[in-house]
Amino acid sequence: MASLFAIGFSKFSPQPTSDYSKLLKVFHPKPYSLKFLFLKTLNPTRFFKVRANDGTEPSDKLQQYFQNQDYDKKYGFLENIDSFTIPKGLSEETIRLISKLKKEPAWILEYRLKAYAKFLKLEEPKWSDNRYPLLDLQDMCFYSAPKKKPTLNSSDIADEADDPKLLEEFDRLDVPLTKKKKCSPKVAVDAVYNSESIAITNKEPLEKSGVIFCSISEAIRKYPDLIKKYLGRVVPSDDNYYAALNTAVFSDGSFCYIPKNTRCPMPLSSYFRMNSIENTGQFERTLIVAEEGSFVEYSEGCTAISHDKNQLHAAVVELYCAEGAEIKYSTRGLCAGDRSKISWTQVEKGFAITWKYPSVVLEGDDSVGEAENARNTSTCDSMLIGDNAAANTYPYIQVKNPSARIEHEASTSKIGEDQIFYFQQRGIDHERALAAMISGFCRDVFNKLPNEFGAEVNQLLSIKLEGSVG
């Protein structure tokens, strides 16, 4: 599966209007506005997401709710980190340079080059009826990394003598790597800055359980047999245009391996930070393998500086779930064994348009498709804020096994002025009224998240954002 989204208005981002005159407006998009699509399924899922902001000025009080600079203070700030960045452009030389910088074995370089050859034969997909400019890959940088990475001690805490700006940036993002804000003992975190994983916390308790949690770059060097066996097994390089692109130029991401009959002792998380004033892409590659009877819970997040230009995050995340295993995550996976299970929970908060293309790979008795009694249920609940908001659901269901049961449910609700008036009559101001209704609407989603992540998402929802058109 490929996950693609724009941070701000990008060259490939869809426009929520067919009026080209609006494309010429001067605007300052922020990386988040409030739009939701929640989908839950017990089977593996696939999603493809594009988010954009057309910079339309707010026209009513509901839209003005989102206008202030809270995002800039919390996530949108820019730190001047001393980094190494390769020249812009995409070519075979670019791919060879990335592989050389990462000191990869020859077989991975060959794997990348084969994907690039497939990519050259594909065309950028033309989605929906929205109009948007084509993506110019030759005007993009495909690798940027800090020159100095943190050094972790035996307690998985960074030495404060390392680049203080880099450590301070993650502290401000509530991803602490130093003694000043000691790492949470409840979650193991892979911190990724632009194109490089810079630190992984709480590795010791994972290693005692036999769990492997490291960057994909480290896994390629240390565990080549596992990578050769599983990389590209769920999402092959020719799956789609952006999957081929990612396979050719992926920089870093997380690798997680849960041995047979092992329960991961803590939730795992990856945090991707994009911090570059240049047109730099982030090409995450994450691979999670759960062997028979194992369990793991994994979440990830991504933030970027507030950017007037475009930034691209094109990710591929593969989940492999063996017989009787369970993975809790939010992307496409393969339930390859009987009674295997993937729980999918996704929270999206961003831009004027959010597109998703969830699909299910069915394979394995009672859990996957080509076998008997498979079942898939997806639910899409949308809340509209303002007179210009819209939510369109286009389910496409194809069943080739008569014993399979596929269900789809969608609902739409809207916050109206009468509801706001009801709150205001009781002394609750406009902003708190909106926050209360949105939080209540999302409660079912929050309850399915670990406590740490549920609180973070709830806090993110409380941020009032500039440039929302909803």
From Swiss-Prot:
Task: Spell out the coiled coil positions from the record.
Answer: none
Write down the InterPro entries for this protein, in alphabetical order: Fe-S_cluster_assembly_SufBD, SUF_FeS_clus_asmbl_SufBD_core, SUF_FeS_clus_asmbl_SufBD_sf, SufBD_N
Listed GO biological process terms: iron-sulfur cluster assembly
- The source's domain of life comes to Eukaryota
Among Pfam families, the record links this protein to: SUFBD_core, SufBD_N
Q: Which family does it belong to?
A: Belongs to the iron-sulfur cluster assembly SufBD family.
Name of the molecule in the record:
Iron-sulfur cluster assembly SufBD family protein ABCI9
Tell me the name of the encoding gene.
Answer: ABCI9
